């Protein structure tokens, strides 16, 4: 009897909360629709896999940090381009006043439709972020960078004045305000951050990020990006080998790593990453200097194979799909499943689940290799 009374009291309380705050304000977790996590691809298949869900989760706070010239803005611009290609609206809050439109365009960003703000101070920047997020019209907003969100008091004060904790308080207040709105509007916020060193640290890493601790707590994903090697063509440097570590992940297991190439003037080499992962998971075979896919040659040397995949995007998409299907990430909901029933089931089952190998396109690689 007591249990029944408690259940009735709970049901009455739930009903009252719904009347007062609206439907969905409170519910049993089992009543929620089990929808897959929506993501924005990063431009690197290896990083999409390391994130565990196929990309950057929608409606969350993401922090990307690392040393100077490690590829933070490049990685973020690829996410911007992918969000735009999916039909999304993107805003870029350039607090550093350093965004290069030509470089962004080379990475695939539609600069004509990119919403750009170059605020005068940190309060203005975060107020703009808050207003844009609450509009519910954005898919992605980028803040570059946290270190450049200088409080108004610091700008208006004298050089050398002490402003301890101002920026940390500003970030804490802003994140408290926007986190709920991000989730409701399914807007992803990427905060690019810089590294600083703590003085007098004897044990452990002296490195820390700017803006206090609030961003560390509110971020669902934190990415540590580092340049590990310089890529050379002869004696000329043509790019960097980059490693990204997922140091925090609330949507999948953390601490996974991804490596990929960033080419100067071109950004992340998606095709190079596909070749590396294809070899690792057995879809692409390497024999000596030759790379082959399903018995057909892609090219001699990684650079030739990369160029061939770049010229044949359908084949690159096919390899990427097989890799993600094997690893169980990034499966698109619009793909037909074998369990469909009804009048269209026969049609769905007869349609191939994976595109047929592009043998005709692959033969071009043999011809190109023969000429060389």
UniProtKB/Swiss-Prot annotation:
Q: Which PROSITE patterns match?
A: RECA_1, RECA_2, RECA_3
Q: Which GO terms describe its molecular function?
A: ATP binding; ATP hydrolysis activity; ATP-dependent DNA damage sensor activity; damaged DNA binding; single-stranded DNA binding
Q: Respond yes or no to whether keyword Cytoplasm is given for this record.
A: yes
Q: What is this protein called?
A: Protein RecA
Which example biological process does GO assign this protein? DNA repair
Species name? Streptomyces ambofaciens
Assigned protein family: Belongs to the RecA family.
Highest taxon of the lineage: Bacteria
